[in-house]
Amino acid sequence: MIQAIVFLPLLAALVAGLGQRAIGATASKILTTGALFTSCALSWPIFLSFVMGTGEAEVVTVLHWVSSGALQFNWELRVDTLTAVMLVVITTVSALVHLYSWGYMEEDPDQPRFFAYLSLFTFAMLMLVTANNLVQMFFGWEGVGLASYLLIGFWYKKPSANAAAIKAFVVNRVGDLGFMLGIFGTFLVFGTVSIPEILTAAPGMAGSSITFLGMRLDTMTILCLLLFIGAMGKSAQLGLHTWLPDAMEGPTPVSALIHAATMVTAGVFMVCRLSPMFETSEVALGVVTFVGAATCLFAATVGTTQWDIKRVIAYSTCSQLGYMFFAAGVGAYGAAMFHLFTHAFFKALLFLGAGSVIHAMHHEQ
């Protein structure tokens, strides 16, 4: 069941993308949208079983992936309460965005390519949230980055779209450098990349120190801060937020998908998933709280001065993500995830509403 949820969008993306000439635009659209609605229909029962309290956390092994010295891990799909919430958010919003794109992209000659990118994006995000080890999470993380680059620069004949896509890609690489260093450091300290093993061992590492750039620093603080830099890049927090407003150059359905449901929530998800690590470091939690609060105020203030309808919503998203990080920083992970869940739906609706307005005004923003 979980394999179907995760791999159906990938299958649809490959067929629609590579076979677009053979099967035509309409078949591509039907295939990708159908796959997404199937994934969505399969993920709701999982979510509801966790809501009712009957759901069991499980790990499904897909294949043995890497075995190199001490570095050994499988490709595994992990289903627990946190994953169940994200599955529902991602598949539902993505399915609705696919459906909306039928009308919105009607006159575009490159429809199969667009739908293939959307499905690929969804697959990468599902890969990220079902990850049971940090390397698989990084795979999903980079996949989302790549797909967002392709989608933001979808109208590649527009110079502004190209510039925005490259900007989003580069700013995210800055954050990803921190995330990579965090993963390397975690492997160095714990000797494993498996998330459950790391979270079990994390409290025991509290108070230990490590040499970093020639200074003795608290191990858990430095690891959590490096991981959080990754979250800042992906979730457009203060300092690495510059790509988010420019990412509005893509088609409106892309904005709804990237900025409401999926990509920007990856950072919040990661902080919540690794919360036992962050709990061991007061400093790291303080930084998360401060950055979240600062972003929340800053982005909302900037948003009030914008004239472009989509940019206003983009800054609003930035501000709401600040709230989520603030909640995570003060230890209210439930509140952070609840806000993530509710925000995804209303923000996607706002973007799609804005898209309808722009469409009706003949692309006047």
Predicted segments with their positions:
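N-terminal signal-anchor/start-transfer transmembrane helix
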Residues: 6-21, 95-96, 232, 236, ...
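Transmembrane helix-loop-helix hairpins at membrane boundaries of multipass inner-membrane proteins
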Residues: 1, 19-116, 188-215, 221, ...
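Residue-level signal for short hydrophobic patches within transmembrane helices
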Residues: 4, 11, 15, 75, ...
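Mature extracytoplasmic enzyme cores
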Residues: 1-7, 85-88, 138-140, 150
